[in-house]
Amino acid sequence: MATACPPLSLQPAYLSGRSARARRPPPAVRCSAVGEVMAETAAVGTAEEPLLVSAIKGRKVERPPVWLMRQAGRYMKSYQLLCERHPSFRERSENVDLVVEISLQPWKVFKPDGVILFSDILTPLPGMNIPFDIVKGKGPVIFDPLRTAAAVNEVREFVPEEWVPYVGQALNILREEVNNEAAVLGFVGAPFTLASYCVEGGSSKNFSKIKKMAFSEPEILHNLLQKFTTSMANYIKYQADNGAQAVQIFDSWATELSPVDFEEFSLPYLKQIVDSVKETHPELPLILYASGSGGLLERLPLTGVDVVSLDWTVDMAEGRKRLGSNIAVQGNVDPGVLFGSKEFISKRIFDTVQKAGNSGHVLNLGHGIKVGTPEENVAHFFEVAKGIRY
């Protein structure tokens, strides 16, 4: 087993902010067995397999791959300018040219190891007979919330080829543009999270409506969850068939469930998705992100995913121990760290990488980038991360 990176005091001056000279793009940093620091050229993906995919599969890599959730978005000036020309989120996320342009904005500036499709977990809803929109300042709005058996019976199975051909087209273009220098990432919403939006009518603070359904009419909720399960499995396969090299499943609201309720209303459906995808796409890496999942951590590998993405409320070393050695991890720097000094950002990166170890780790935040994050700090995050060597 290779040694972890050296103590922070051994990092080069350009990382600690002590250098008075103008900052230049840093060399890579190799952490040798005796803790010395050497410069070398940064690693890139191969023609056969991107670095991110290699790391997830447990292959020996020189450094942890890095990308950031919401890396394409409102903190970037280029995105803000595009929004002025195209104020509708639905337009930005459903027009092939705009999806490709936005997805590539961080790639052109930061060169992350993962380029994630610009989209939304609710994008499939119209194809399931669930009208919605995303309203500025309010977020997603489900026009006719699903709160009765009759309403759930009207939900149809999602056929991505018919309803979101622009997703497939955009993924194919991204693969051509990125050319294995980074992994192209797709994503979907998890059944319970999608059901939460659709039953609540949008975002929620207390999730009283879906919990009322779960605890008084569970058969209705199970019917809805099964429809989302079948549909999201199909959607993942569609994304993979059109160029996605890994897919992340977002179960953002699963942490509103107690462990026993997670085992009934989320875990079996996630496992069913994974089992279905692995039957047809056994080599496709699947990542599961469940924000605030510290109380559920040991249950997440039971879904069968390849990677568990940790949020920042779980210590990386503790998370590794609790998850076990047979699963890769992603994360888990606090997004708020990107508002700190460059020296502090560097320290948190090294701390996370040291605790994660030198295998099966994808460096990321513990949540999406926050609005207002200084773009130069994001650039620094990528510079430092891509300079690390195991």
Curated annotation (Swiss-Prot):
Molecular functions (GO terms): uroporphyrinogen decarboxylase activity
GO BP: chlorophyll biosynthetic process; protoporphyrinogen IX biosynthetic process
Primary localisation category: plastid
Domain of life (superkingdom): Eukaryota
Cellular component aspect of the GO annotation: chloroplast
Keyword annotations of the record: Chlorophyll biosynthesis, Chloroplast, Decarboxylase, Lyase, Plastid, Porphyrin biosynthesis, Transit peptide
Site-annotated residues for Transition state stabilizer: D120
The protein's annotated pathway: Porphyrin-containing compound metabolism; protoporphyrin-IX biosynthesis; coproporphyrinogen-III from 5-aminolevulinate: step 4/4
Gene3D superfamilies in alphabetical order: 3.20.20.210
E.C. code: 4.1.1.37
InterPro entries: UROD/MetE-like_sf, Uroporphyrinogen_deCO2ase_HemE, Uroporphyrinogen_deCOase
Transit peptide, from-to: 1-30
Reaction catalysis annotation: uroporphyrinogen III + 4 H(+) = coproporphyrinogen III + 4 CO2
Entry annotated with the keyword Transmembrane helix: no
Intracellular or extracellular location(s): Plastid, Chloroplast
UniProt binding sites for substrate: R70, Q71, A72, G73, R74, F89, S119, D120, Y197, S252, H367
Subunit description: Homodimer.
Biological function: Catalyzes the decarboxylation of four acetate groups of uroporphyrinogen-III to yield coproporphyrinogen-III.
Entry's family note: Belongs to the uroporphyrinogen decarboxylase family.
Protein name: Uroporphyrinogen decarboxylase 2, chloroplastic
